[in-house]
């Protein structure tokens, strides 16, 4: 699936346990159609001890969210993204109100 989202974009989560939360995209996996949003969809991960002297630990980590479950969020407005050309330059804009990004 082709996406117009980029790393660092502010997005709103549309479904799941963090529905309605807003965060920035930390990474995008285009092959699996997943995004990781900072401080959202946190899961606990168990890290095993590597040596007998070292202890195992439990850490909180962001889990991937399907790209269809997020939408771009700018200045209180969430909308789909569009692309148009102005002066031979690709411009991303909000389809709801035409605002440039």
Swiss-Prot record:
Keywords: Ribonucleoprotein, Ribosomal protein, RNA-binding, rRNA-binding. Signal peptide: none annotated. Gene3D superfamilies: 2.30.30.30. The keyword Cell division does not apply. InterPro entries: KOW, Rib_uL2_dom2, Ribosomal_uL24, Ribosomal_uL24_CS, Ribosomal_uL24_KOW, Translation_prot_SH3-like_sf. The keyword rRNA-binding applies. One of its GO terms (molecular function) is rRNA binding. GO terms for biological process: translation. One of its GO terms (cellular component) is ribosome. Part of the 50S ribosomal subunit. PANTHER family: MITOCHONDRIAL RIBOSOMAL PROTEIN L24. One of two assembly initiator proteins, it binds directly to the 5'-end of the 23S rRNA, where it nucleates assembly of the 50S subunit. One of the proteins that surrounds the polypeptide exit tunnel on the outside of the subunit. NCBIfam families: rplX_bact. Belongs to the universal ribosomal protein uL24 family. This is Large ribosomal subunit protein uL24.
